[in-house]
Amino acid sequence: GGGGYIGSHIVEKLVKKNINVFILDNLVTGFKRLVNKKATFIKGDIFNTTKVKMIIIKNNIDSIIHLAAYLDVSEAEKYKQKYNQNNIKGTLKLMEACKNSMVRNIIFSSSCSIYGNVIGSVNERKKPNPQGYYAYTKYKGEQIIKKYAKAYNYKYAILRYFNVAGASSSNKIGEIQKSHGHLIKNLAIQSLKKKPQVVIYGDNYDTKDGTCIRDYMHVSDLADIHLKSLDYINKKSKSLVLNCGYGKGYSVLDIV
């Protein structure tokens, strides 16, 4: 997933630290122009277990950052088989490829949506209660990671993202995926007069202005969390489950 929005920001920070990075991306939702030229790019996907295992062994790869997933919440409800195949079975295939190799650290891209409909703040000890199918696929992905970590002595960091926004200060990468649901990106486009209006969905939430409240995190900070988590599990030999947000929510109208 190194050719995607979040993945490209993580890679940018890794190569700045002179870490040898290999990107595996089928570019179905990623973009070749987001692929960092200082990393080794291999076009392919996680379903080709033989190819993935060969890449791991040939290059003595010891850490995997797994970002390959579909992430459209509405689409997931319509095309459950597609999301089951990619997000759940894809994770299973990747873990199979890691067996009996040099891999010792796994970073998994999860989601705060696994908690379900929560009022107020939530910590990592709260029992997951996924409501939608996308959330369910992320929850199952976490279970797969934990199962293989226990069986094959991996260390993992499961990172539960809240809402991600922003772009690298390098001005070379950013959020270019076509999406109707990314509020901050849509407002930026609208403010540049490239879009006639932004439609706000939902005005009857139990909030001060009736619109949904979300915790937004800058993508560069989220990328830093991946690097720090990798460093932690590598040095401490302990696994982690972390919420990734600032702990402060903003309503849709606040953002507007």
What do the predicted segments below correspond to?
Residues K99, K147-A151, H180-S191:
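Basic phosphate/pyrophosphate-binding loop/patch that engages nucleotide-derived ligands
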Residues N84, Q131-Y139, I173-K185, D215-Y216:
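Short-chain dehydrogenase/reductase
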Residues G44, I56, Y83, E175-S179, ...:
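Pocket-edge positions in alpha/beta enzyme catalytic cores
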Residues N186-V256:
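C-terminal substrate-binding subdomain of Rossmann-fold SDR/epimerase-dehydratase oxidoreductases
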Residues K32, F162-L183, K195-R214:
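Short, flexible, glycine-rich and Lys/Arg-enriched loop motifs at helix boundaries
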Residues H9, H66, H182, H218, ...:
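Histidine-centered active-site/metal-ligand motif
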Residues G1-A165:
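N-terminal Rossmann-like NAD(P)+-binding domain of SDR-like oxidoreductases, especially those catalyzing
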